[in-house]
UniProtKB/Swiss-Prot annotation:
[4Fe-4S] cluster binds at residues 280, 283, 315, 322. The lineage of its organism: Bacteria, Bacillati, Actinomycetota, Actinomycetes, Kitasatosporales. Belongs to the IspG family. Gene3D superfamilies: Dihydropteroate synthase-like, Sulfite Reductase Hemoprotein, domain 1. Converts 2C-methyl-D-erythritol 2,4-cyclodiphosphate (ME-2,4cPP) into 1-hydroxy-2-methyl-2-(E)-butenyl 4-diphosphate. This is 4-hydroxy-3-methylbut-2-en-1-yl diphosphate synthase (flavodoxin) 1. Keywords: 4Fe-4S, Iron, Iron-sulfur, Isoprene biosynthesis, Metal-binding, Oxidoreductase. InterPro entries: Dihydropteroate_synth-like_sf (IPR011005), IspG_bac (IPR016425), IspG_bac-typ (IPR004588), NO2/SO3_Rdtase_4Fe4S_sf (IPR045854). It comes from Streptomyces avermitilis (strain ATCC 31267 / DSM 46492 / JCM 5070 / NBRC 14893 / NCIMB 12804 / NRRL 8165 / MA-4680).
Length: 385
Protein backbone atom coordinates (compact mmCIF):
# COMPACT_ATOMS: atom_id res chain seq x y z
CA UNK A 1 0.00 0.00 0.00
CA UNK A 2 1.26 3.47 -0.87
CA UNK A 3 2.35 5.43 2.22
CA UNK A 4 -0.25 8.14 2.75
CA UNK A 5 -0.44 10.56 5.66
CA UNK A 6 -3.83 10.19 7.31
CA UNK A 7 -3.39 13.16 9.62
CA UNK A 8 -5.62 13.97 12.58
CA UNK A 9 -9.35 14.62 12.11
CA UNK A 10 -10.12 18.31 11.68
CA UNK A 11 -11.81 20.17 14.53
CA UNK A 12 -15.57 19.76 13.94
CA UNK A 13 -17.57 22.85 13.08
CA UNK A 14 -19.99 23.95 15.80
CA UNK A 15 -23.44 25.20 14.85
CA UNK A 16 -23.85 27.33 17.97
CA UNK A 17 -22.33 28.04 21.33
CA UNK A 18 -23.64 25.78 24.05
CA UNK A 19 -26.26 27.30 26.33
CA UNK A 20 -24.76 28.12 29.71
CA UNK A 21 -26.23 25.87 32.38
CA UNK A 22 -25.35 24.66 35.82
CA UNK A 23 -23.82 21.19 35.97
CA UNK A 24 -25.10 18.25 37.98
CA UNK A 25 -23.59 14.84 38.55
CA UNK A 26 -25.69 11.78 37.68
CA UNK A 27 -23.52 9.06 39.14
CA UNK A 28 -20.33 9.09 37.08
CA UNK A 29 -21.86 11.19 34.29
CA UNK A 30 -21.77 14.98 34.37
CA UNK A 31 -24.83 16.65 32.85
CA UNK A 32 -24.92 20.31 31.88
CA UNK A 33 -22.21 22.94 31.98
CA UNK A 34 -19.46 22.05 29.53
CA UNK A 35 -20.05 18.28 29.81
CA UNK A 36 -20.66 16.47 26.51
CA UNK A 37 -24.30 15.79 25.64
CA UNK A 38 -25.05 12.32 27.00
CA UNK A 39 -27.32 9.62 25.59
CA UNK A 40 -29.74 7.66 27.71
CA UNK A 41 -32.55 5.14 27.42
CA UNK A 42 -35.09 3.30 29.54
CA UNK A 43 -35.46 -0.40 30.20
CA UNK A 44 -38.57 -2.23 29.03
CA UNK A 45 -38.35 -5.04 31.57
CA UNK A 46 -40.23 -5.29 34.83
CA UNK A 47 -37.77 -3.74 37.24
CA UNK A 48 -38.63 -6.39 39.83
CA UNK A 49 -37.09 -8.95 37.45
CA UNK A 50 -33.56 -8.04 38.48
CA UNK A 51 -31.80 -10.49 36.16
CA UNK A 52 -33.66 -9.40 33.04
CA UNK A 53 -33.25 -5.72 33.91
CA UNK A 54 -29.51 -6.01 34.48
CA UNK A 55 -29.16 -7.99 31.26
CA UNK A 56 -30.90 -5.24 29.30
CA UNK A 57 -28.78 -2.59 31.01
CA UNK A 58 -25.66 -4.52 29.98
CA UNK A 59 -26.87 -4.56 26.37
CA UNK A 60 -27.57 -0.84 26.51
CA UNK A 61 -24.15 -0.16 28.01
CA UNK A 62 -22.48 -2.11 25.21
CA UNK A 63 -24.36 -0.03 22.64
CA UNK A 64 -23.09 3.25 24.10
CA UNK A 65 -25.83 4.16 26.58
CA UNK A 66 -24.49 6.38 29.37
CA UNK A 67 -27.48 6.67 31.72
CA UNK A 68 -30.44 4.31 32.09
CA UNK A 69 -33.88 4.85 33.58
CA UNK A 70 -36.01 2.13 35.15
CA UNK A 71 -39.71 2.17 35.95
CA UNK A 72 -40.88 1.85 39.53
CA UNK A 73 -44.68 1.40 39.64
CA UNK A 74 -44.81 -1.19 42.45
CA UNK A 75 -43.26 -2.02 45.79
CA UNK A 76 -41.54 -5.05 44.25
CA UNK A 77 -39.87 -2.71 41.76
CA UNK A 78 -38.80 -0.37 44.55
CA UNK A 79 -37.34 -3.31 46.47
CA UNK A 80 -35.21 -4.24 43.44
CA UNK A 81 -33.65 -0.79 42.99
CA UNK A 82 -30.77 -1.20 45.44
CA UNK A 83 -29.41 -4.31 43.73
CA UNK A 84 -29.87 -2.87 40.25
CA UNK A 85 -28.24 0.46 41.17
CA UNK A 86 -25.29 -1.36 42.73
CA UNK A 87 -24.71 -3.84 39.89
CA UNK A 88 -25.43 -1.62 36.88
CA UNK A 89 -22.41 -0.56 34.82
CA UNK A 90 -23.98 2.87 34.22
CA UNK A 91 -25.93 5.30 36.44
CA UNK A 92 -29.53 4.27 37.14
CA UNK A 93 -32.39 6.76 37.37
CA UNK A 94 -35.64 5.67 39.02
CA UNK A 95 -38.76 6.84 37.16
CA UNK A 96 -41.49 7.68 39.66
CA UNK A 97 -45.18 8.35 39.07
CA UNK A 98 -48.23 8.47 41.35
CA UNK A 99 -46.65 7.35 44.66
CA UNK A 100 -44.27 9.73 46.48
CA UNK A 101 -43.12 6.91 48.76
CA UNK A 102 -41.18 5.42 45.84
CA UNK A 103 -39.20 8.66 45.48
CA UNK A 104 -37.81 8.12 48.97
CA UNK A 105 -37.26 4.41 48.29
CA UNK A 106 -35.22 5.23 45.18
CA UNK A 107 -33.10 7.77 47.03
CA UNK A 108 -32.45 5.32 49.86
CA UNK A 109 -31.62 2.58 47.34
CA UNK A 110 -28.72 4.61 45.96
CA UNK A 111 -30.12 5.46 42.54
CA UNK A 112 -27.97 8.01 40.71
CA UNK A 113 -31.00 10.28 40.23
CA UNK A 114 -34.78 10.24 40.49
CA UNK A 115 -37.27 11.43 37.88
CA UNK A 116 -40.48 12.80 39.34
CA UNK A 117 -43.63 13.67 37.43
CA UNK A 118 -45.28 16.61 39.20
CA UNK A 119 -48.44 16.12 37.16
CA UNK A 120 -49.42 12.79 38.66
CA UNK A 121 -47.66 12.25 41.99
CA UNK A 122 -50.23 12.55 44.75
CA UNK A 123 -49.85 15.78 46.75
CA UNK A 124 -46.42 16.24 45.19
CA UNK A 125 -46.11 19.89 46.18
CA UNK A 126 -46.67 18.99 49.83
CA UNK A 127 -43.83 16.44 49.67
CA UNK A 128 -41.19 18.66 48.11
CA UNK A 129 -39.64 19.68 51.43
CA UNK A 130 -39.13 16.05 52.47
CA UNK A 131 -37.90 15.02 49.01
CA UNK A 132 -35.43 17.91 48.89
CA UNK A 133 -34.09 17.01 52.34
CA UNK A 134 -33.62 13.32 51.47
CA UNK A 135 -32.10 14.07 48.07
CA UNK A 136 -29.69 16.60 49.56
CA UNK A 137 -28.58 14.18 52.28
CA UNK A 138 -27.83 11.46 49.70
CA UNK A 139 -26.50 13.74 46.94
CA UNK A 140 -29.25 12.59 44.59
CA UNK A 141 -30.24 14.86 41.68
CA UNK A 142 -33.92 15.22 40.81
CA UNK A 143 -35.29 15.44 37.28
CA UNK A 144 -38.51 17.38 37.08
CA UNK A 145 -40.09 15.50 34.19
CA UNK A 146 -43.12 17.34 32.85
CA UNK A 147 -45.12 15.41 30.28
CA UNK A 148 -47.94 16.71 28.08
CA UNK A 149 -49.95 13.55 28.69
CA UNK A 150 -50.01 13.99 32.45
CA UNK A 151 -50.02 17.75 32.90
CA UNK A 152 -51.51 19.12 36.10
CA UNK A 153 -55.27 19.65 35.76
CA UNK A 154 -54.99 23.26 36.92
CA UNK A 155 -52.70 24.10 34.02
CA UNK A 156 -54.93 22.34 31.50
CA UNK A 157 -57.83 24.45 32.73
CA UNK A 158 -55.74 27.61 32.49
CA UNK A 159 -54.30 27.03 29.00
CA UNK A 160 -56.94 24.72 27.49
CA UNK A 161 -54.34 22.14 26.45
CA UNK A 162 -50.69 21.23 26.87
CA UNK A 163 -49.15 24.32 25.29
CA UNK A 164 -45.44 25.17 25.49
CA UNK A 165 -46.32 27.81 28.08
CA UNK A 166 -48.20 25.27 30.21
CA UNK A 167 -45.30 22.81 30.15
CA UNK A 168 -42.77 25.49 31.08
CA UNK A 169 -44.95 26.92 33.85
CA UNK A 170 -45.32 23.47 35.39
CA UNK A 171 -41.58 22.83 35.32
CA UNK A 172 -40.54 26.20 36.71
CA UNK A 173 -43.19 26.11 39.42
CA UNK A 174 -41.92 22.79 40.70
CA UNK A 175 -38.32 23.96 40.47
CA UNK A 176 -39.22 27.01 42.54
CA UNK A 177 -40.60 24.76 45.29
CA UNK A 178 -37.28 22.90 45.48
CA UNK A 179 -35.42 26.21 45.46
CA UNK A 180 -37.41 27.32 48.51
CA UNK A 181 -35.67 24.48 50.35
CA UNK A 182 -32.26 25.40 48.94
CA UNK A 183 -32.20 22.43 46.56
CA UNK A 184 -30.91 23.10 43.04
CA UNK A 185 -29.45 19.74 42.03
CA UNK A 186 -32.08 19.63 39.30
CA UNK A 187 -32.48 18.91 35.62
CA UNK A 188 -35.70 19.49 33.70
CA UNK A 189 -37.62 18.01 30.79
CA UNK A 190 -40.80 19.30 29.12
CA UNK A 191 -41.88 16.57 26.73
CA UNK A 192 -44.63 16.57 24.12
CA UNK A 193 -45.41 14.20 21.25
CA UNK A 194 -45.52 17.09 18.76
CA UNK A 195 -41.95 18.13 17.88
CA UNK A 196 -43.00 21.73 17.17
CA UNK A 197 -44.65 22.16 20.58
CA UNK A 198 -41.70 20.41 22.23
CA UNK A 199 -39.11 22.63 20.53
CA UNK A 200 -40.98 25.81 21.48
CA UNK A 201 -41.32 24.62 25.08
CA UNK A 202 -37.59 23.94 25.42
CA UNK A 203 -36.68 27.27 23.83
CA UNK A 204 -38.85 29.09 26.36
CA UNK A 205 -37.50 27.00 29.22
CA UNK A 206 -33.88 27.56 28.16
CA UNK A 207 -34.44 31.31 28.22
CA UNK A 208 -35.95 31.29 31.71
CA UNK A 209 -33.61 29.08 33.75
CA UNK A 210 -30.06 27.75 33.89
CA UNK A 211 -30.88 24.16 34.82
CA UNK A 212 -29.54 21.39 32.56
CA UNK A 213 -32.17 20.14 30.12
CA UNK A 214 -33.09 16.57 29.25
CA UNK A 215 -34.44 16.48 25.68
CA UNK A 216 -37.15 14.08 24.63
CA UNK A 217 -40.15 13.73 22.33
CA UNK A 218 -42.61 11.67 24.32
CA UNK A 219 -44.52 8.83 22.67
CA UNK A 220 -42.60 9.48 19.47
CA UNK A 221 -43.93 6.31 17.86
CA UNK A 222 -42.57 3.30 15.94
CA UNK A 223 -38.91 3.22 14.94
CA UNK A 224 -39.13 5.11 11.64
CA UNK A 225 -41.62 7.77 12.75
CA UNK A 226 -39.97 8.20 16.14
CA UNK A 227 -36.53 8.56 14.61
CA UNK A 228 -37.74 11.33 12.30
CA UNK A 229 -39.55 13.19 15.08
CA UNK A 230 -36.60 12.98 17.44
CA UNK A 231 -34.04 13.93 14.79
CA UNK A 232 -36.08 16.98 13.78
CA UNK A 233 -36.68 18.17 17.35
CA UNK A 234 -33.23 17.39 18.74
CA UNK A 235 -31.53 18.79 15.66
CA UNK A 236 -33.37 22.09 16.00
CA UNK A 237 -32.55 22.48 19.69
CA UNK A 238 -29.01 21.09 19.77
CA UNK A 239 -28.07 23.23 16.78
CA UNK A 240 -29.02 26.23 18.94
CA UNK A 241 -26.92 24.97 21.86
CA UNK A 242 -29.96 23.79 23.85
CA UNK A 243 -29.87 20.35 25.47
CA UNK A 244 -27.58 18.50 27.85
CA UNK A 245 -28.76 14.89 27.69
CA UNK A 246 -31.09 13.14 25.24
CA UNK A 247 -33.41 10.17 25.19
CA UNK A 248 -34.87 9.02 21.87
CA UNK A 249 -38.24 7.41 22.65
CA UNK A 250 -39.09 4.63 20.20
CA UNK A 251 -41.57 1.77 20.11
CA UNK A 252 -38.58 -0.46 19.47
CA UNK A 253 -35.86 -2.28 21.44
CA UNK A 254 -34.02 0.22 23.71
CA UNK A 255 -30.70 -0.41 21.95
CA UNK A 256 -32.22 1.16 18.83
CA UNK A 257 -32.81 4.36 20.82
CA UNK A 258 -29.11 4.55 21.58
CA UNK A 259 -28.09 4.01 17.96
CA UNK A 260 -30.34 6.85 16.84
CA UNK A 261 -29.25 9.15 19.67
CA UNK A 262 -25.56 8.64 18.97
CA UNK A 263 -26.11 9.17 15.25
CA UNK A 264 -27.92 12.46 15.92
CA UNK A 265 -25.03 13.73 18.05
CA UNK A 266 -22.45 12.62 15.50
CA UNK A 267 -24.38 14.30 12.68
CA UNK A 268 -24.29 17.59 14.61
CA UNK A 269 -20.57 17.22 15.40
CA UNK A 270 -21.41 16.94 19.09
CA UNK A 271 -19.65 13.60 19.30
CA UNK A 272 -16.60 12.13 17.58
CA UNK A 273 -17.84 10.30 14.52
CA UNK A 274 -17.14 6.61 14.29
CA UNK A 275 -17.32 4.49 11.16
CA UNK A 276 -19.37 6.31 8.52
CA UNK A 277 -20.44 4.72 5.26
CA UNK A 278 -21.34 7.28 2.59
CA UNK A 279 -23.14 5.69 -0.35
CA UNK A 280 -25.06 7.12 -3.27
CA UNK A 281 -28.82 6.46 -3.46
CA UNK A 282 -28.33 4.91 -6.92
CA UNK A 283 -29.93 5.97 -10.18
CA UNK A 284 -29.96 5.02 -13.86
CA UNK A 285 -26.29 5.99 -14.15
CA UNK A 286 -25.14 3.39 -11.63
CA UNK A 287 -23.08 0.62 -13.18
CA UNK A 288 -22.94 -1.49 -10.02
CA UNK A 289 -25.45 -2.69 -7.41
CA UNK A 290 -24.80 0.11 -4.90
CA UNK A 291 -27.29 -1.20 -2.32
CA UNK A 292 -25.63 -4.61 -2.18
CA UNK A 293 -22.14 -3.12 -2.23
CA UNK A 294 -22.89 -0.72 0.65
CA UNK A 295 -24.54 -3.44 2.73
CA UNK A 296 -21.62 -5.84 2.26
CA UNK A 297 -19.05 -3.18 3.14
CA UNK A 298 -21.07 -2.15 6.21
CA UNK A 299 -21.35 -5.76 7.36
CA UNK A 300 -17.65 -6.35 6.79
CA UNK A 301 -16.65 -3.33 8.87
CA UNK A 302 -19.19 -3.82 11.65
CA UNK A 303 -17.69 -3.08 15.06
CA UNK A 304 -14.82 -0.98 13.76
CA UNK A 305 -14.20 1.77 16.31
CA UNK A 306 -12.17 4.40 14.52
CA UNK A 307 -13.44 7.64 12.93
CA UNK A 308 -13.24 6.29 9.39
CA UNK A 309 -15.31 7.59 6.47
CA UNK A 310 -15.82 5.13 3.64
CA UNK A 311 -17.49 6.21 0.36
CA UNK A 312 -19.22 3.62 -1.81
CA UNK A 313 -20.18 5.25 -5.11
CA UNK A 314 -21.78 3.75 -8.19
CA UNK A 315 -20.87 5.97 -11.13
CA UNK A 316 -18.42 8.55 -12.47
CA UNK A 317 -20.58 11.65 -11.77
CA UNK A 318 -20.17 12.07 -8.00
CA UNK A 319 -18.15 8.93 -7.39
CA UNK A 320 -14.58 10.17 -7.77
CA UNK A 321 -15.29 13.40 -5.86
CA UNK A 322 -16.97 11.69 -2.91
CA UNK A 323 -14.33 8.97 -2.85
CA UNK A 324 -11.57 11.58 -2.73
CA UNK A 325 -13.23 13.38 0.20
CA UNK A 326 -13.42 10.18 2.25
CA UNK A 327 -10.65 8.40 4.13
CA UNK A 328 -11.30 5.44 1.86
CA UNK A 329 -13.57 5.09 -1.12
CA UNK A 330 -14.47 3.39 -4.35
CA UNK A 331 -15.77 4.86 -7.60
CA UNK A 332 -17.32 2.02 -9.59
CA UNK A 333 -18.02 1.60 -13.29
CA UNK A 334 -17.37 -0.56 -16.33
CA UNK A 335 -16.98 -3.69 -14.22
CA UNK A 336 -14.22 -2.32 -12.02
CA UNK A 337 -13.62 0.00 -9.09
CA UNK A 338 -11.02 2.67 -8.44
CA UNK A 339 -9.92 2.53 -4.80
CA UNK A 340 -9.05 5.88 -3.21
CA UNK A 341 -7.22 6.55 0.06
CA UNK A 342 -7.27 10.19 1.17
CA UNK A 343 -7.94 11.38 -2.36
CA UNK A 344 -5.29 9.28 -4.11
CA UNK A 345 -6.04 6.33 -6.36
CA UNK A 346 -4.06 3.41 -4.97
CA UNK A 347 -5.39 0.65 -7.21
CA UNK A 348 -8.08 -0.44 -9.64
CA UNK A 349 -9.76 -3.78 -9.01
CA UNK A 350 -12.41 -5.94 -10.71
CA UNK A 351 -15.97 -5.41 -9.46
CA UNK A 352 -15.87 -8.83 -7.79
CA UNK A 353 -12.95 -7.69 -5.61
CA UNK A 354 -14.30 -4.29 -4.50
CA UNK A 355 -15.75 -5.36 -1.14
CA UNK A 356 -12.77 -7.53 -0.24
CA UNK A 357 -10.33 -4.76 -1.16
CA UNK A 358 -12.21 -2.03 0.72
CA UNK A 359 -12.31 -4.13 3.88
CA UNK A 360 -8.59 -4.94 3.62
CA UNK A 361 -7.65 -1.29 3.11
CA UNK A 362 -10.00 -0.17 5.90
CA UNK A 363 -8.29 -2.55 8.31
CA UNK A 364 -4.87 -1.17 7.33
CA UNK A 365 -6.04 2.41 7.81
CA UNK A 366 -7.65 1.55 11.15
CA UNK A 367 -4.40 0.01 12.37
CA UNK A 368 -2.47 3.10 11.30
CA UNK A 369 -5.02 5.41 12.98
CA UNK A 370 -4.76 3.47 16.23
CA UNK A 371 -0.96 3.51 16.03
CA UNK A 372 -1.05 7.28 15.45
CA UNK A 373 -3.32 7.73 18.47
CA UNK A 374 -6.34 9.02 16.61
CA UNK A 375 -9.30 8.85 18.99
CA UNK A 376 -11.79 6.12 18.38
CA UNK A 377 -15.53 6.68 18.25
CA UNK A 378 -18.62 4.55 18.41
CA UNK A 379 -19.33 2.83 15.07
CA UNK A 380 -22.22 4.31 13.11
CA UNK A 381 -23.55 4.15 9.58
CA UNK A 382 -25.16 6.85 7.46
CA UNK A 383 -26.29 6.87 3.85
CA UNK A 384 -25.91 10.08 1.90
CA UNK A 385 -26.56 10.99 -1.68
Amino acid sequence: MTAISLGMPSVPTKLAERRKSRQIQVGTVAVGGDAPVSVQSMTTTRTSDIGATLQQIAELTASGCQIVRVACPTQDDADALAVIARKSQIPVIADIHFQPKYVFAAIEAGCAAVRVNPGNIKQFDDKVKEIAKAAKEHGTPIRIGVNAGSLDRRLLEKYGKATPEALVESALWEASLFEEHDFRDIKISVKHNDPVVMVNAYRQLAAQCDYPLHLGVTEAGPAFQGTIKSAVAFGALLSEGIGDTIRVSLSAPPVEEIKVGIQILESLNLRQRGLEIVSCPSCGRAQVDVYKLAEEVTAGLEGMEVPLRVAVMGCVVNGPGEAREADLGVASGNGKGQIFVKGEIIKTVPESKIVETLIEEAMKIAEQMEADGIASGEPSVSVAG
